[in-house]
């Protein structure tokens, strides 16, 4: 910490601006990191930010994403990064080094140990991109105990109350994001002209130095930021990565040094700065629970230890706006009247159907199907899409983005956008596009305002579609609403999705009471992100006599890694802005998942499900691909109802439970979607499974490939 303070003190005495440089550890090769660190210093870097790679960054542009991916392929993890700092120190690195990254790898390593080991390795502090304020206080105290700095981030959208709080926890400098969007820079784009005003606003609350990041790529841009009153200028790694790419074999350190000299002006005559932003006498604050009140949520943000907002600073204001709009809406009878007025469009209430043949097959409890598959667009997803569209209109958004896996949420979102005349962009993993090609056509058939963008990063599935949608939202906050499809993501998304899906459970309770005069004994739903399941479960949580059963995708079996059984096999962590159960490796990197059903192929789960699991209120079990196919076949052939592959997981487990119960009991299974979308996929898969399932469909009916 003291080394960082000393840099800014020396620069102030020289009437100069500190040069802060960023590079991703392990890029382009593991062995390049130490020479690159030394080259940054030789090129004039006063402080170095060393990026800890993460598999699923949500605020980084394509260049840094690529650097993260390459670094992870080079087996870079937290201990490796610390080893590189040690080696660089031994070879003469004296510049302060800040470790910059996302919280989950540190959480997996162990927060206390991560801080202690960083200090011993020679690091000087941390910049955590997605650490919430309530946790930042404790984290900062731990850092200070090891003489490490915690550097908070402030964005152009940060409110004055939040600036006041963040300024109170800054001990060496504040990292100021000068423009909204993902990381990246361009020599041809001007730095935010409002920068002097932004810096002046922050200085009302602090005397610590301000280092400005985003958009700096050239010496002229560096000088502009310095003249605006910045105490430090951050040259983000995208430009340094491009310099590395331009280098030939063995030339990386020299190219990096040359670029840094060009930007920093090292070796050139000293330059007199233009008068900067006016200095004010800041109010002095001590970080505590009282100062954190400026960043409190107006709706409950956590379910036990799960939930929260683990997001970049640039998203915080948009989430607060959304939270306030949702609270206002759900307290407004006119809003719910408008929602209910659309039930004739979405085909609510959905039927509660007694599956007599399935019940007879099981020989136990009555099996009831909640027919969400009969909704407009073919699944429960329309409930949430309609509710969020009305919210988006309420806050004046004109552009809608969404992620989709099986395509059901994509179709529902594109459909309601067509109805309300809004622009619509759907992100879909390239693998899911392959599995659900007809869904893509159906979305784009809805009109010129709707289109699908295939995502080719990572595993090319739902997880990666969420990443891209998040990045889009960060960049286009003023016009865009991110219509999240499942009960995932940062607060308030899990609450919003639940509030628009809980109609499922409310209807089940009323409908079964009408025909049976009682509550169900068991309710069953499939669980990926968990929207249909939380919608089914929520109204029954206080009813302790009702057993809640969520069915996860067991894939090829949970004894290996090809599954999506997050609650059964995962550990608590942070993914896509929320603390919940996730599937991760020992280093805190998100692992690739597998399910025969695209909609369940996700390595996280809604935080309310995580709480229901840990509290023991709900049980979560797994169903393999094979058993899901058996459930698909069973319902299709016994009832003439073709279920979605996602719902087939719940069908299999529901029948299994029904067999164990007496005939006077009632089990309700949420049939979350219809299987029209999966018929082509089943026809392609069936030859592989035919003998194992003893399911032989005429070869003339199966298209040859």
From Swiss-Prot:
- Write the protein's name: Tryptophan synthase
The membrane spanning regions, by residue number, are none
Tell me which GO cellular component terms the UniProt record holds.
cytoplasm
Matches recorded under CDD domains: Trp-synth_B, Tryptophan_synthase_alpha
Q: Where is this region: Disordered?
A: 266-287
Family in the record: In the N-terminal section; belongs to the TrpA family. In the C-terminal section; belongs to the TrpB family.
Which residues are the active-site ones?
49 (proton acceptor), 60 (proton acceptor)
| UniProt keyword terms in alphabetical order | Amino-acid biosynthesis, Aromatic amino acid biosynthesis, Lyase, Pyridoxal phosphate, Tryptophan biosynthesis
Annotated source species: Coprinopsis cinerea
């Amino acid at each position: 910490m003291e080394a960082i303070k000393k840099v800014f003190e020396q620069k102030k005495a020289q009437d100069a601006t500190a040069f802060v440089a960023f590079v991703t550890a392990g890029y382009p090769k593991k062995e390049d990191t130490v020479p690159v660190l030394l080259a940054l210093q030789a090129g004039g870097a006063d402080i170095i930010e060393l990026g800890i790679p993460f598999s699923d960054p949500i605020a980084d542009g394509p260049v840094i994403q690529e650097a993260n991916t390459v670094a992870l392929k080079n087996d870079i993890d937290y201990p490796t990064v610390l080893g590189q700092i040690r080696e660089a120190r031994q070879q003469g690195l004296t510049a302060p080094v800040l470790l910059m990254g996302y919280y989950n790898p540190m959480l997996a390593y162990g927060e206390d140990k991560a801080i202690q080991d960083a200090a011993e390795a020679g690091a000087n502090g941390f910049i955590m991109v997605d650490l919430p304020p309530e946790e930042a206080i404790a984290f900062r105290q731990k850092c200070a105990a090891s003489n490490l700095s915690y550097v908070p981030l402030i964005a152009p959208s940060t409110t004055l109350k939040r600036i006041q709080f963040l300024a109170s926890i800054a001990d060496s400098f504040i990292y100021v994001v000068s423009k909204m969007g993902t990381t990246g820079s361009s020599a041809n784009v001007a730095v935010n002209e409002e920068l002097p005003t932004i810096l002046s606003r922050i200085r009302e609350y602090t005397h610590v130095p301000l280092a400005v990041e985003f958009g700096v790529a050239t010496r002229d841009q560096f000088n502009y930021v310095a003249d605006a009153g910045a105490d430090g200028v951050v040259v983000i790694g995208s430009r340094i990565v491009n310099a590395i790419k331009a280098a030939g074999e063995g030339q990386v350190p020299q190219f990096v040094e040359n670029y840094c000299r060009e930007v920093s002006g090292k070796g050139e005559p000293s330059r007199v700065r233009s008068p900067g932003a006016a200095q004010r006498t800041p109010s002095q604050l001590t970080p505590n629970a009282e100062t954190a009140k400026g960043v409190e949520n107006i709706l409950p943000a956590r379910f036990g230890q799960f939930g929260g907002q683990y997001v970049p600073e640039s998203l915080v204001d948009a989430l607060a706006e959304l939270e306030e709009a949702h609270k206002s809406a759900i307290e407004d009878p006119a809003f719910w009247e408008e929602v209910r007025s659309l039930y004739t469009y979405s085909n609510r209430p959905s039927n509660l159907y007694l599956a007599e043949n399935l019940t007879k097959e099981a020989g136990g409890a009555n099996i009831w199907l909640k027919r969400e598959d009969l909704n407009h667009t073919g699944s429960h997803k329309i409930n949430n899409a309609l509710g969020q569209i009305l919210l988006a209109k309420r806050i004046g958004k004109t552009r809608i983005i969404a992620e989709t896996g099986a395509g059901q949420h994509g179709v529902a979102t594109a459909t309601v956008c067509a109805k309300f005349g809004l622009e619509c962009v759907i992100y879909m993993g390239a693998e899911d596009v392959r599995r659900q090609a007809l869904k893509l056509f159906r979305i784009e058939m809805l009109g010129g305002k709707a289109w699908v963008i295939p995502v080719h990063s990572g595993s090319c599935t739902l997880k990666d579609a969420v990443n891209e949608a998040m990045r889009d939202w960060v960049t286009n906050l003023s016009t865009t609403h991110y219509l999240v499809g499942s009960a995932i993501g940062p607060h308030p998304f899990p609450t919003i999705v639940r509030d628009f899906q809980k109609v499922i459970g409310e209807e089940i309770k009323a409908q079964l009471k009408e025909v049976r005069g009682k509550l169900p004994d068991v309710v069953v739903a499939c669980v990926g992100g968990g929207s249909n399941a939380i919608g089914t479960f929520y109204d029954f949580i206080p009813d302790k006599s009702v057993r809640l059963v969520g069915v996860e995708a067991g894939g090829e079996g949970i004894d290996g890694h090809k599954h999506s059984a997050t609650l059964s096999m995962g550990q608590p962590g942070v993914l896509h802005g929320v603390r919940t159960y996730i599937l991760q490796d020992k280093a805190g990197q998100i692992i690739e998942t597998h399910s025969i059903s695209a909609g369940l192929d996700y390595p996280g789960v809604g935080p309310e499900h995580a709480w229901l699991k840990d509290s023991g209120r709900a049980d979560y079990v797994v169903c393999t691909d094979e058993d899901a196919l058996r459930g698909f076949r069973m319902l299709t052939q016994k009832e003439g109802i073709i279920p979605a592959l996602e719902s087939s997981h719940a069908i299999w487990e529901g029948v299994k439970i029904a067999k164990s119960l007496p005939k006077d009991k009632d089990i309700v299974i949420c049939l979350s979607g219809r299987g029209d979308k999966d018929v082509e996929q089943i026809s392609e898969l069936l030859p592989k499974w035919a003998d194992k399932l003893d399911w032989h469909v005429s070869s003339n009916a199966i298209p040859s490939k």
